[in-house]
Regions:
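Short aromatic/hydrophobic "clamp" motif used to bind/position activated sugar donors
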Residues: 84
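Membrane-interface aromatic/basic loop that binds lipid-linked glycans or pyrophosphate carriers
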Residues: 258-315
């Protein structure tokens, strides 16, 4: 069995060597690595080519800059292994990463998705986010768990499943695209397994752009995608997805409040949002009354009032 590893990189010449070296160090050796160079203007491509010349398992695919979700799709198309996994270029994995993710396959060869844990590094603090003990859940059961797999990385995906549902992965989303991809793919899964190990090292850097700094357009794209998912029958009883929808609407409104665009332009932007899904059953346990009210205004297309309130509330 071969595992395809996909690393999407844009101007990552400084951090990429650590990531690639962690792949080379894997105790499970039957892997191939595809580095998708998404239009880098630094030495990323040259660096990967040097690695490829030393290890035949390493491959470079270069394309014009199209964004992270498009790069991930390119990686899926390139993958030749039976299973695949994503690693972000500025992260790295422990040497047992692949071995641990493959472990459930010994007893459950039908597995389409195996979710592992990760270590989160932020502001000098390390937080362990562990998946449940190795066990099987149907996708509909998974969404009720307090632990819910949002990232697309730290996951072993069945390659044929990913290729079959390639069209479910939205393009040109550069913010929280891994969350959106997960929400799009889960309704198609037959099963989900968990590996309790946290071998993935996830870094939140001080240079990362905050949501407040993101453009209205970026947040509009991701909020629209999450709203569409929240309206799917599959997700309508999910506290997690319902809260996620409110979360991105709030971030969008905060960006609106800091935008220099005219009210008419902001109203035009908000009109592009799919109607959000709201349900009174979630109000007391998940959402504050203010956020619920803003979403109610969106649902009833009170765009001018919403822009006015956002300017007051978030400034």
């Amino acid at each position: 069995m071969k595992v395809s590893i996909v690393i999407c990189a844009y101007n990552e010449e400084e951090k990429l060597p650590r990531c690639i070296d962690s792949v080379i160090a894997q105790t499970f050796s039957n892997w191939e690595l595809w580095v998708i160079n998404d239009g880098s203007t630094d030495s990323t491509a040259k660096l990967v080519q040097q690695y490829a010349e030393q290890d035949h398992r390493i491959h470079l695919h270069s394309q014009e800059n199209q964004g992270l979700s498009s790069a991930r799709k390119a990686g899926i198309e390139c993958a030749q292994g039976e299973y695949l996994t994503f690693i972000d270029a500025d992260d790295y994995v422990g040497e047992l990463y692949l071995e641990h993710l493959l472990e459930p396959l010994h007893q459950h060869p039908e597995a389409q998705c195996i979710q592992g844990g990760h270590l989160r590094y932020e502001n000098g603090n390390i937080t362990k986010v562990a998946a449940p003990e190795t066990s099987h859940f149907s996708p509909s059961e998974v969404i009720t768990l307090s632990y819910h797999p949002r990232p697309i990385w730290a996951v072993l995906w069945e390659s044929s499943f990913m290729k079959q549902h390639l069209d479910s992965i939205p393009e040109h989303i550069n913010l929280a695209e891994d969350i959106v991809i997960t929400l799009q793919l889960y309704p198609h899964l037959k099963n989900v397994y968990f590996s309790p190990y946290a071998d993935y090292h996830y870094f939140i850097h001080g240079t990362n752009m905050s949501y407040a700094q993101r453009s209205v357009l970026d947040l509009l794209k991701v909020s629209s995608a999450v709203n569409k998912c929240a309206n799917l029958d599959y997700w309508k009883n999910s506290d997690f997805v319902f809260s996620l929808q409110f979360n991105f609407i709030a971030k969008l409104l905060k960006a609106v409040s800091h935008s220099s665009a005219s009210t008419s332009d902001l109203v035009s932007a908000l009109r592009q949002l799919p109607t959000p899904h709201i349900s009174i059953q979630f109000l007391k346990r998940s959402i504050g009354y203010g956020s619920y009210f803003y979403t109610w205004l969106l649902k009833h297309r009170c765009y001018k009032l919403l822009v006015y309130l956002a300017k007051i509330r978030f400034k």
